[in-house]
Amino acid sequence: MYGEGESEPVPEQVAQFAQEAYQLHMMECLLTVMPRLEFEARKDIVQIFVALLQRSIGSRRPTVEYVWTHPAILRMAIRGYDVPDIALNTGIILHEMLQYELLAKLFLYSDDLYRFPQYIETTSFSISCDAFKNLRDALLCHRSIAAEFLNMHYDRFFHMYTQLLDSQNYVTRRQSLKLLGELLVDRAHYATMIRYVSDEENLKRIMNALRDRSKHIQLEAFHVFKVFVANPKKTPAVESILRRNRSRLLTFLQGFLPDRTGMLAMAHPSFTSHYSHTHTRACILIGAAFSLCCTHSFACFFFFFSQTNHSLTSASISSTSLGTCTMPDGARVNALVHSAMPSTS
């Protein structure tokens, strides 16, 4: 599959090997015997899977098509997380499968998707991280497939995902909040976002996360919370909660916003790679202030869905996109934050 020494593999031999692998159901057999093999042999199996999956004939991926018609292979790769000795090996195989839209769809619509809270919560740190990474890839790498899936299976998926958001494990909670924030501000997930931020129970959960002792969890929760506030068509229940808690939220946010620049830089180093510290801080404050300003809801939505990758430039935060306000000083920021919540009157 990889050639011998420095020589390239012979295409005819690779094709013959692949055909025999399909005919003999070798992929299923290798996953079955993997727990009984030595460490180096497991690594060899991973290389075989990766090579087969990457093999192409023109625009076709024969092995991807084969796995699509033999879903037990994907199921076995997922359930490798049940066996600690091979979990990271099968995790690599699953990761390679999820690079292809067809198999990502097979993964999302599989009942085995709902085993992932167990894999993330009850396994070792390395296995938990690997399982979460594969779940994240499935939701983010193929946006149209994921959006269609979430629209069709919203209730079942978020019933599962709430388990991760409510986890007692710091890493699980932080990464789950971060992924949720990424999903909600992605244009492909607009319908899911509207449905999520219309539910008052979701708002309560995120507001509780804002009170977490961890500043990093507070930060990730804030990125989700501001989507609730920015929604121009809040449900009565959501608006009522924001109205009742307006004073406490404003007090919290006035102290929360100014000192988050350094934390954001540590969490997302690429954000500051092309901007000065002063410019970055101003951008964060502008984004936060406008995303909380109910009187600028549509400007805020423009900001969210055009800047999801934080690619901020002076043009993208002009008065055209954000109303009449320009770079705010501290007083201006406080005034904008103060207008964040619905009036209590």
Enumerate the language-model features and the residues they cover.
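Eukaryotic intrinsically disordered, low-complexity regulatory tails and linkers enriched
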Residues: H277, R281-A282, A335-S345
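Long, repeat-rich segments with strong aromatic
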Residues: T162-K234
